[in-house]
Regions:
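N-terminal signal-anchor transmembrane alpha helix
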Residues: 1-2
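Juxtamembrane/interfacial segments at transmembrane-helix boundaries in multi-pass membrane proteins
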Residues: 5-31, 135-197
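Internal transmembrane alpha-helices of multipass membrane proteins
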Residues: 18-31, 36-135, 199, 203-204
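Short, hydrophobic/aromatic alpha-helical segments in well-folded domains
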Residues: 81-82, 123, 159, 179, ...
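Extended, hydrophobic alpha-helical segments in both membrane/secreted and soluble proteins
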Residues: 191, 204-209
Length: 209
């Protein structure tokens, strides 16, 4: 299905393709709004290709541990893929934040249930670092909303682009909040210390994703 959408002309227009939007919490400006452009579609295709490759690569290892664990593993990987697609397709800043943070849940269980001997320590460390970055990002997300035009669709990226009423200093602090959250996930120095434990203890497919 993802590859079929490539037939659409996603690169010849500034308009998003396959766009869909529904108000969810209009009092707070939150909408379910998704759509793709050329970049988003490329990332979605990459996620759609990598996930089955990771599942096939881990098939024998997980199958040896029993059918119930196999079901949990494949379910977690598919949930993670769904959240990744949501991150790439979201056109509402708050919805993007929800998908971005929701990815922590399947990754935490992938490490904690299917990792190496120190998997619990690695999973908790990854979770704490990511939650700390996510909370800082949430502050920036809320600040962006109040600096924007507001309204029932105040979190839509198209409404926020070029319409933030804030001082240069405030905008810099908003950027810092997003940067810290992305730096944790990247990961970048000095917030990278969760990486050696997580990638060492995580199952191979989890590390790839």
């Amino acid at each position: 299905m993802v590859l079929a959408t490539q037939k659409g002309d996603t690169g010849a227009t500034e308009q998003l393709q396959l766009a869909e939007g529904h108000p969810r919490i209009p009092q707070c400006g939150v909408s379910y709004a998704v759509g793709v452009d050329g970049i988003a579609l490329s990332l979605i295709v990459m996620a759609a290709i990598l996930t089955p490759i990771c599942l096939l690569a881990a098939w024998n290892d997980v199958s040896e541990e029993g059918y119930s664990r196999e079901k949990r593993y494949f379910a977690l990987m598919l949930v993670l893929e769904a959240f990744m697609v949501g991150v790439f397709a979201a056109t509402d800043v708050f919805l993007f934040y929800v998908f971005f943070e929701a990815m922590l849940i399947p990754v935490y269980f992938l490490i904690g249930l299917f990792g190496g001997p120190r998997r619990q320590y690695a999973a908790v460390k990854f979770l704490l670092f990511s939650l700390a970055g996510g909370l800082i990002m949430l502050v920036s997300v809320i600040a962006v909303y109040f600096a924007g035009p507001g309204g029932s669709d105040g979190f839509l990226i198209e409404n926020l682009t070029g319409n933030l009423d804030a001082s240069p200093e405030a905008l810099r602090w908003m950027f810092v909040g997003f940067f810290i959250a992305f730096a944790v996930k990247a990961p970048m120095w000095p917030v990278h210390t969760w990486l050696p434990d997580a990638h060492t203890e995580a199952p191979t497919a989890g590390s790839v994703i």
